[in-house]
C-alpha cells in the first residue's frame, strides 16, 4: 500500500512531533508499505522518510522546484519527483497514494488534509483518511467542524469520511482497512463542502 503522510516541516516544534513522525516511518516500513511524502529533509518530513528508509522501506518524495532550490529536497528518496508548484505536488501525492495519514502540522498540512477530506466527502475517492493526534492538536478542528454541522454547513457524515486516532497502532489499523464509501446524493452535494 502506498501511504501518503502529511506532516510538519517547521523547525520550531517540540521534539515529540518529530519522534512521532519517525515512529510512523519505521512502522510503515515494518508493515511493508511505501511512503509517499512531501520530499523534504526537514522536521517531521525528514524524520518520517529517514526512519522509513532505515527500516528498509521504499520512499517516494514529491517536492516543488522552489524547495529544491533552497536545498531541502530529500535526494536519498527511492524516487524523487520535482513539480512546478505546490498544486501539482498535491496532485501527484494524491495520484500516487492508496491511503492518507495526517500527523500534527501547520497550515500546509491543513490544506492537504482539507483537499483529501473534501474529495472523500464528495465521494470522489474512498481511500482511507486518518488523523493521528496523540496530543489533541486537532481537537479544536474537530470542534469547529462539529459547530459547522450544528449550523447546517456540513452533513453529519462529514466525520464518516475520516478516522481520528491517538496511537500509531490504531492509525495503521484504519489505514489498512477499506472504509465505507461516502456517497452523497445530488441534493446533498451542496452541503458537502459548504
Segments predicted by a language model, with ranges:
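Active-site/ligand-binding-proximal alpha/beta "capping" segment
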Residues: 88-123, 130, 181-189
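Glycine-rich phosphate/nucleotide-binding loop
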Residues: 103, 124-127, 135-140
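A cross-family phosphate/adenosyl-ligand binding-site feature
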Residues: 1-96, 134-174, 178-194
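Flexible, glycine/proline-enriched loop segments at strand-loop-helix junctions
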Residues: 103-104, 128-132, 159-162
